[in-house]
C-alpha cells in the first residue's frame, strides 16, 4: 500500500490548508521546546479509494510532534493528519501500515502514535445516528468505534483516545 516512506526536513512539508501539518506549525512547536519530524510517503490511489484500473501514485507527507512523557518514554503525535483520507473500508489498514512504516523514523523509546484525524466520522452518514430533526446524536460507544476502525487491519491495535 505505502512506498517511499522516508524522513525529510520540516521546511519541505507540502503546502496544505491544515495549519497543524505545516512547516510553520513545526516552527511554532519547536519554539515551545517540542521536537518535530516530517515524513514523506506515497500510496497507490487504488489502495486508498478502491478504484480499479488507472494506477496513480499519490505523494503525501505528515508532521509528527514528539513528546517526552518521562525520562524513559516518548509519544508521537500527528495533529490533524494524515491529510489523505482513504475510503471508509481502507482507513484502518492505511493507518496501520502507515504506523508500522513510521516505526523506523521514531525514537526507540516511542510507545505510541496518536492521530488526531480530520476525517469525516464513520457515523456522519448513518441516519440512525441522527434524531427526527436531523441533529447528530453523536458517536456510538467506544468499543463499537474501535471495532469499526480496526476492521480490515491485521493487528487490531487501534484504541479510541
Residue ranges and their predicted role:
Residues 1-161:
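N-acyltransferase acceptor-side catalytic subdomain
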Amino acid at each position: 500500500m505505502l512506498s517511499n516512506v522516508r524522513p525529510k526536513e520540516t521546511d519541505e512539508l507540502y503546502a496544505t490548508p491544515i495549519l497543524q501539518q505545516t512547516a510553520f506549525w513545526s516552527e511554532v512547536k519547536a519554539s515551545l521546546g517540542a521536537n518535530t519530524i516530517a515524513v514523506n510517503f506515497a500510496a497507490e490511489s487504488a489502495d486508498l479509494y478502491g478504484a480499479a484500473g488507472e494506477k496513480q501514485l499519490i505523494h503525501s507527507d505528515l508532521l509528527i510532534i514528539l513528546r517526552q512523557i518521562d525520562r524513559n518514554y516518548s509519544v508521537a503525535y500527528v495533529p490533524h493528519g494524515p491529510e489523505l483520507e482513504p475510503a471508509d473500508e481502507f482507513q484502518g489498514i492505511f493507518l496501520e501500515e502507515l504506523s508500522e512504516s513510521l516505526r523506523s523514523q521514531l525514537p526507540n523509546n516511542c510507545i505510541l502514535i496518536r492521530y488526531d484525524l480530520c476525517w469525516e466520522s464513520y457515523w456522519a452518514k448513518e441516519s440512525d445516528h441522527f434524531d427526527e430533526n436531523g441533529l447528530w446524536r453523536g458517536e456510538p460507544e467506544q468499543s463499537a468505534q474501535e471495532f469499526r476502525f480496526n476492521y480490515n487491519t491485521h493487528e487490531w491495535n487501534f484504541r479510541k483516545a
